[in-house]
A protein has these predicted regions:
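Non-heme Fe(II)-dependent double-stranded beta-helix
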Residues: 7-109, 113-117, 236-240
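Non-heme Fe(II)/2-oxoglutarate
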Residues: 28, 32, 40, 157-161, ...
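Histidine-centered active-site/metal-ligand motif
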Residues: 59-61, 110, 152, 206, ...
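Generic beta-strand structural signal
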Residues: 86-95, 105, 127-133, 143, ...
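Short edge-strand/loop segments of extracellular domains
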Residues: 98-101, 148-156, 223-229
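A short secondary-structure junction signal
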Residues: 105-111, 118-120, 141-147, 156-160, ...
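Short, conserved beta-strand element in jelly-roll/cupin
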Residues: 118-140, 191-194, 222-226
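Double-stranded beta-helix
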Residues: 125, 138-204
Length: 243
């Protein structure tokens, strides 16, 4: 399907620490209106990674030791091992805070994968994944995740009308009746509890419902590379396709 859920991976004290920390961030950091559909786009890095970047901190980019705590979390690493994910490594040494404010709009359908002109785009196994946690329980009412299973490997009609996910064009769309917000017949809701780990292939079409509550709904997302393309997973038994 292109995604999986591992319940209850993130627990206290780290879950409570992340909840308090992320709430504090949004109390002091202004959110760029360009990211109204995501809710925010705040990148936070490990201190070691930040030192290598040699840049000035801004509201959108800064470092915090809590990032390393999450990346090193033993239960998360074990979940990846149990799923057969090999050579999992942080893509950039950071995480992204995506927080839909009270009564925030929906997030459009999109794929986050960017290396479409490379053979890895056709690989039958993932090469880039996100590992994410919601800081509160999610439902359709407060903007839970939506996915279209199988679209990491299968083209559908929606692909023909989607602008590039990483350009101003899609951010500039104001019509909430546009197909990028549609309730696609193959889509499913993915409600989660706080602390549940959701892992998804970057090629998977996904979106989120609007937040119709008066409470913020925050997601902590960390991109990871997985497997070492072009080498297949060690457990791969089928013929390796010529991609």
């Amino acid at each position: 399907d292109g995604f999986t859920i591992v319940p209850g991976v993130l627990g206290d004290p780290l879950l409570s620490e992340l909840q308090s920390w992320s709430q504090d961030v949004f109390e002091r950091v202004p959110v760029d209106p360009r990211y109204r559909y995501q809710g925010s786009d705040i990148h936070v890095y490990t201190p070691d990674r930040w030192q290598l970047m040699d840049r000035e901190a801004t509201h959108q980019h800064f470092s915090d030791p809590i990032v390393q705590k999450l990346l090193d979390q033993p239960e998360q690493k074990q979940a990846c091992i149990d799923l057969g994910l090999e050579d999992v490594r942080s893509a950039g040494g950071g995480l992204i805070l995506l927080s839909k404010p009270a009564f925030g709009p929906p997030l459009y359908w999109h794929q986050d994968f960017m290396n479409w002109n490379h053979p890895e785009a056709a690989a039958p196994w993932p090469t880039k994944i996100f590992l994410s946690y919601y800081m509160s329980d999610t439902t359709r009412e407060n903007g839970c995740l939506r996915v279209i299973p199988g679209t990491h490997r299968r083209r559908i009609d929606l692909h023909d009308v989607l602008p590039n996910a990483h350009t101003p064009e899609i951010q500039a769309i104001d019509d909430l009746d546009h197909p990028i917000f549609a309730d696609h017949p193959d889509s499913i809701d993915v409600p989660l509890n706080s602390g549940d780990l959701i892992i998804a292939d970057a090629r998977l079409l996904h979106a989120a419902w609007p937040n119709q509550t008066d409470q913020r709904r925050t997601l902590v997302l960390a991109w990871h590379d997985v497997f070492s393309f072009p080498q297949p997973p060690s457990w791969w038994e089928g013929e390796v396709p010529d991609v």
